Swiss-Prot record:
It comes from Arabidopsis thaliana. One of its GO terms (molecular function) is DNA-binding transcription factor activity. The NAC domain includes a DNA-binding domain and a dimerization domain. Expressed in the root cap, in both columella (COL) and COL-adjoining lateral root cap (LRC) cells. Also present at low levels expression in the tips of cotyledons and the cotyledon vasculature, as weel as in vasculature of the first pair of true leaves and at the hydathodes. GO terms for cellular component: nucleus. Its main location: nucleus. Keywords: Activator, Developmental protein, DNA-binding, Nucleus, Transcription, Transcription regulation. It holds the Pfam family NAM. It is found in: Nucleus. Residues 8-156 form the NAC domain. This is Protein BEARSKIN1.
Length: 305
C-alpha cells in the first residue's frame, strides 16, 4: 500500500474518541511503542499552517473533516512552562478551561481547546480553525513523559450564518403574511371579543327570554295529565313573557310567570308554582294550581306520589 493514502485500506475512516486518543495512541507514542498502522503523523506545529494540514495529515482516500497529528511541545522560554504555538501566518490561542478526560476508572489526561488567529498577538484576526490538544496527566514519577501531545484540528461549521439565512427567509415570509392580513382583513384593529360579542343592548331595553315550552311527556299509566294542564297552558305561556323592567327601580311592571321546577325528575316536572306581585307590596303570595292539587290527591290514592 502506498504512503499517499496513509497505508490504510479503501473505505477506512478514522474517528477515535478522546479516551482512545489518550489511552492508546498518545500513551504508545510517549512510550516509544510501535503502531501496527501509522495513521497519525508527526507534525511541527510551529512550521505548518492549519489549512496545510488537510494534505499533510490526510488518511486514506475518503473526505475528511478532522485531521490528527502528534506534536512535540516547544517551550516558549527555556525555563518557562508556556508553550510556543506561533506559526508564520498567525498563532494558536488557548480558550476556556482545560477539560478532564476520564475512563471508567480514573483520570487519564486533559484536553485544551485553541483557536487560530491570523497576525501577531495580541492583535489578530480570529478564524474558524479549532484545535483540541490532548496531553497525558503530568506526573513527577513518569519517566516516559517526553512532551508529546496529540492534536485534532477541524474547521468550525458556520451554522450561525446558515441559521440566519433560514431565519431571515422565515421572518420575511411572516412579514409578507402579516402585510397581506393588513391589506385584506376588514376586521383590522378589532379584538376577538368585539367580533364575537352580541349586539349591544340599550339601557332601556331588556332582553326577551325565549318561550318556555314543556318538553316532558306525561306518564302513560292510565291517566291523561295533559287534560288537567290544558286550562293552565295559555296562562303558563303568558306568564313567561315579561313586558319590561324600569331602569333604576326594583319594581316589576307586570306579572312574572311560573317558575318551572323540572330540575329533579319527570314526575316533579308537572308541578308548578305561581308568584304574583301587585307592584306595591314586596311580599309575594304562592298559589298552588288547583288542578295539580286534585291530581296529587288522586295519584296519592293510587300510590304514584
Amino acid at each position: 500500500m502506498s504512503s499517499s493514502n496513509g497505508g490504510v485500506p479503501p473505505g477506512f475512516r478514522f474517528h477515535p474518541t478522546d479516551e482512545e486518543l489518550l489511552h492508546y495512541y498518545l500513551k504508545k507514542k510517549i512510550s516509544y511503542e510501535k503502531f501496527e498502522m501509522e495513521v497519525i503523523k508527526e507534525v511541527d506545529l510551529n512550521k505548518i499552517e492549519p489549512w496545510d494540514l488537510q494534505d499533510r495529515c490526510k488518511i486514506g482516500s475518503t473526505p475528511q473533516n478532522e485531521w490528527y497529528f502528534f506534536s512535540h511541545k516547544d517551550r516558549k522560554y527555556p525555563t518557562g512552562s508556556r508553550t510556543n504555538r506561533a506559526t508564520h501566518s498567525g498563532f494558536w490561542k488557548a480558550t476556556g478551561r482545560d477539560k478532564c478526560i476520564r475512563n471508567s476508572y480514573k483520570k487519564i489526561g486533559m484536553r485544551k481547546t485553541l483557536v487560530f488567529y491570523k497576525g501577531r498577538a495580541p492583535h489578530g484576526q480570529k478564524t474558524d480553525w479549532i484545535m483540541h490538544e490532548y496531553r497525558i496527566e503530568d506526573t513527577e514519577d513518569d519517566p516516559c513523559e517526553d512532551g508529546w501531545v496529540v492534536c485534532r484540528v477541524f474547521k468550525k461549521k458556520n451554522l450561525f450564518k446558515v441559521g440566519n439565512d433560514v431565519g431571515s427567509n422565515i421572518s420575511n415570509n411572516r412579514l409578507e403574511a402579516r402585510s397581506f392580513i393588513r391589506r385584506e382583513s376588514p376586521y383590522q384593529g378589532i379584538s376577538m371579543f368585539e367580533l364575537n360579542k352580541p349586539e349591544e343592548i340599550s339601557v332601556h331595553q331588556y332582553p326577551q327570554p325565549p318561550m318556555f315550552q314543556p318538553h316532558h311527556k306525561p306518564l302513560s299509566i292510565g291517566y291523561d295529565y295533559s287534560l288537567a294542564l290544558l286550562p293552565r297552558e295559555s296562562e303558563y305561556q303568558q306568564a313567561c313573557q315579561p313586558s319590561g323592567v324600569e331602569v333604576g327601580t326594583c319594581k316589576a311592571v307586570s306579572e312574572w310567570g311560573i317558575v318551572n321546577c323540572n330540575m329533579v325528575s319527570h314526575e316533579d316536572s308537572s308541578r308548578a308554582m305561581r308568584f304574583e306581585d301587585d307592584g306595591n307590596n314586596t311580599s309575594s303570595t304562592v298559589q298552588p294550581p288547583s288542578n295539580l292539587l286534585s291530581l296529587r290527591g288522586e295519584n296519592g290514592f293510587l300510590g304514584l306520589f
